[in-house]
From Swiss-Prot:
Coiled coil: none annotated. This is Cobyric acid synthase. InterPro entries: Class_I_gatase-like, CobQ/CobB/MinD/ParA_Nub-bd_dom, CobQ_GATase1, CobQ_N, CobQ_synth, GATase_3, P-loop_NTPase. GO terms for molecular function: ABC-type vitamin B12 transporter activity; catalytic activity. Belongs to the CobB/CobQ family. CobQ subfamily. Pathway: Cofactor biosynthesis; adenosylcobalamin biosynthesis. Catalyzes amidations at positions B, D, E, and G on adenosylcobyrinic A,C-diamide. NH(2) groups are provided by glutamine, and one molecule of ATP is hydrogenolyzed for each amidation. The active site is at C333, H430. The lineage of its organism: Bacteria, Pseudomonadati, Pseudomonadota, Alphaproteobacteria, Hyphomicrobiales.
């Protein structure tokens, strides 16, 4: 089995995903055959892997950093929250049903076999596997049957490095507290720690590093400064969206309602990277900006529930006002379904609401179906006759008069719909704005001269800068020697 190192955090959103992506690129730059692995992920920000299943978007990015095709085995267990009490369970890329609270806790030991099978497949032929944990290993209420953190590490005998986030404060207490809470068997798996997201003079933290080592016995592998390259990489968690603030006025304002179960929000990243575009994430309780030229209704894990939430916030009325002012609207996947006259869910796939009136901005209707469409696609934009590469992850079939004006052509069938005046658009395709020529033409049609940015190259450049920053700030030789 390949050598491996596992990175666990003192909590969620400490930066594990990006750190692992950066370290994957570091290892690749050093000539190692490196692979990413995350036993269990909880995220609605999913990707379609190169072998045709669903994985966390973070593992897709990590595979890119490794320079290898993504695989369902890089993230064998994916939980996609769809209600407050339950998540859709994806095992090795395929839907296995719904996981609810206590039932899932009882199911986890059975999933360890799939996790270990995938871990072996990922490690086959690799020099190094970099493993990412989930949340915190100190959640002792979740330790029994754990497959995400120490349960996996002890089962697979993989050494652990703890990651602490100093930007949120309390990093010393987080690390020392984790040491205190962990049972002896788990504590013995930890070989050291690193500090992430430091701002200012790092030398001022030297005494604190020594104190953490004194309290825990763990060595420090370094302090990672706040790296600007991180902001140019796709974020995994919607919590990052909540921190977005408006900047200087740009030529085009793109407003995005923050739906409770927003999914695949990295669709927006190429727009955010355009110098003339400002993407405004609109939180619940706030109004859509009146100066927006485009409103994007994003993907969602629960279309009907999020449509109800959209109405509760008054965004439906604001959308109508936006259209009357001459604004444009783009619905992606679940957002596309919302734009129609009606959504029917006769089998109750999404919940108890079996039929709901849509926003009525497109003359279409959607019927949910049990079979889930999961695939990477090559398409042609029928708006601008430009090639597109994207992916579909959805349930439901949409039909209606406005489908006669499709958004794109995928092989032998059409996708999406466009209103007669061309200002309301919908598509099932995720990732369309990553296509540079399409994005530039799309923005030009909205009165904005798009730049010459190559989005994929910009992501590669950001990964390169991230790797350089980690090489400069961490004891990479010491880290890799753990495996």
């Amino acid at each position: 089995m390949a050598r491996a190192i596992m990175f666990q955090g003192t909590g969620s959103d400490v930066g594990k995903s990006v750190l692992v992506a950066g370290l994957c690129r570091v290892a690749r730059n050093r000539g190692l055959k490196v692979r990413p692995f995350k036993p269990q992920n909880m995220s609605n920000n999913a990707a379609v892997s190169d072998d045709g299943g669903e994985i966390g978007r973070a593992q897709w990015l990590q595979a890119l950093a490794c320079g290898v095709p993504s695989s369902v085995h890089m993230n064998p267990v994916l939980l996609k929250p769809q209600t407050d009490m339950g998540s859709q369970l994806i095992v090795q890329g395929q839907v296995r049903g719904e996981a609810r609270g206590r039932y899932y806790q009882e199911l986890k030991p059975q999933l360890m076999a799939a996790v270990m099978e995938s871990f072996a497949k990922v490690g086959d032929g690799a020099d190094l596997v970099l493993v990412e944990g989930a949340g915190s290993p100190a959640e002792i209420n979740l330790r029994a049957g754990d497959i995400a953190n120490m349960g996996f590490a002890t089962h697979a005998d993989v050494p652990v490095v703890l990651v602490g986030d100093i930007d949120r404060g309390g990093v010393i207490a987080s690390l020392v507290g984790t040491h205190t809470i962990l049972p002896q068997e788990d504590r013995a798996m930890v070989r050291g720690f690193l500090i992430n997201k430091f701002r200012g003079d790092i030398s001022l933290f030297d005494d604190s590093l020594a104190a953490i080592t004194r309290f825990t016995g763990w060595r420090s592998f370094g302090v990672v400064p706040w790296l600007k390259a991180v902001s140019r990489l796709p974020a995994e968690d919607s919590v990052v969206l909540e921190r977005a603030v408006r900047g200087d006025k740009k030529a085009l304002i793109v407003a995005v309602p923050m739906l409770p179960r927003i999914a695949n929000f990295d669709d927006l990243d190429p727009l955010k990277a355009e110098p003339a575009v400002e993407v405004v994430m609109v939180p619940p309780g706030s109004s859509l900006p009146a100066d927006a030229g485009l409103v994007v209704l994003p993907g969602t894990k629960s279309t009907i529930a999020d449509l109800l939430a959209l109405r509760e916030n008054g965004w439906d009325r604001e959308l109508v006002a936006h259209v009357k002012r001459g604004g444009h609207v783009l619905g992606i996947c679940g957002g596309f379904q919302m734009l129609g006259r009606r959504i029917s869910d006769p089998a109750g796939i999404e919940g108890n609401v079996r039929d709901i009136e849509g926003l009525g901005l497109l003359d279409i209707e959607t019927m949910t179906e049990p079979e889930k469409v999961v695939r990477n696609v090559e398409a042609v934009s029928l708006l601008h006759d430009e090639p597109l590469e994207g992916y579909e992850i959805h349930i439901g079939r949409t039909s209606g008069p406005d489908m006669a004006r499709p958004f794109a052509r995928i092989g032998d069938h059409d996708d999406g719909a466009v209103s007669p005046d061309g200002r309301i658009m919908g598509t099932y395709l995720h990732g369309v704005f990553s296509a540079d020529r399409f994005r530039h033409h799309f923005l030009r049609a909205l009165g904005v001269e798009g730049g010459q940015m190559n989005y994929r190259e910009s992501v590669e450049e950001a990964l390169g800068e991230l790797a350089e920053g980690l090489e400069a700030s961490l004891d990479i030789d010491g880290l890799f020697a753990l495996a």
